[in-house]
Design a protein with these regions (language model features):
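Amphipathic alpha-helical segments
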Residues: 90-108, 161-173
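Short, compact, well-ordered microdomains
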Residues: 157-191
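Short aromatic-glycine-(Arg/Gly/Cys) micro-motifs in beta-strand/loop hairpins
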Residues: 1-18
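An N-terminal amphipathic alpha-helical segment
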Residues: 67-75, 98-148
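Long, compositionally biased intrinsically disordered terminal regions
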Residues: 49-52, 62, 138, 143-149, ...
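Short, mixed-charge low-complexity intrinsically disordered segments
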Residues: 39-68
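A short, exposed loop/beta-hairpin motif centered on an aromatic-Gly-Thr core
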Residues: 16-27, 155
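A short, charged, amphipathic alpha-helix used as a generic interaction element across diverse proteins
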Residues: 24-45, 167
């Protein structure tokens, strides 16, 4: 008979994937245990088996994140509908860019009014198949974008500042970012995007 699962939780694994400790109630607790041991390791959420192997599973935090990201991706403009495909490289790129934006704490903008969030503003992601990238810009709340409650000069300055800030963040995350055709928008292409640990 094969192994049967015993406990689901956070575990600390060594470099050789050997079980070092756990279960822990959170990833932070597992990472703190790693610091306490002084030995290299990694925190993994999963099922501990009878032979002490750990089968990775999505953590509650992962599941909540994926649900939130999915909600944000639903805000993409209708022009993405014909492009979203496992075979299209832009699909992977827009998902990576969207994840980076949302991880930063910024919402995606609902450019075409698919959800009630359209007036709130956020980051616009527009496909650019000819350039093999995603055009990124900032959309302000309707109070600024439509009604210009602080005046046109302030609205224009905020638009350019926020768009540049988003571009700077994506550059820091390893994407290739360049000003798009002399506009205030930026073209984002795939670069050397790195994933960091929670301690970096």
């Amino acid at each position: 008979m094969g192994d049967t699962s015993t406990t689901l939780g956070w575990w600390l694994l060594g470099d050789d994937d050997r079980l070092v400790g756990g279960p822990f109630t959170s990833q932070v607790d597992a990472a703190l245990a790693e610091l306490a041991t002084g030995a290299p390791g990694r925190a993994v959420y999963g099922l501990r088996m009878d032979d002490d192997a750990v089968l990775p599973r999505f953590s509650p935090e992962d599941q909540a994140w994926l649900a939130h990201l999915s909600d944000q991706l639903n805000r993409l403009a209708e022009e993405w509908d014909t492009l979203i495909s496992d075979a299209d490289p832009l699909t992977g790129l827009v998902c990576e860019v969207a994840a980076a934006v949302v991880e930063t704490g910024l919402p995606l903008h609902d450019c075409t009014g698919r959800t009630p969030s359209r007036p709130l503003g956020g980051v616009c992601l527009t496909p650019s198949p000819a350039q093999g990238g995603v055009i990124v810009s900032w959309a302000q709340h309707d109070r600024m974008a439509v009604h210009r409650v602080r005046g046109g000069a302030a609205a224009d300055a905020a638009q350019e500042t926020m768009t540049a800030a988003v571009a700077d963040v994506l550059t820091a995350y390893g994407f290739d970012v360049a000003r798009f055709d002399g506009s205030i928008a930026y073209l984002v292409q795939a670069g050397e995007v790195e994933q960091s640990s929670i301690w970096d």
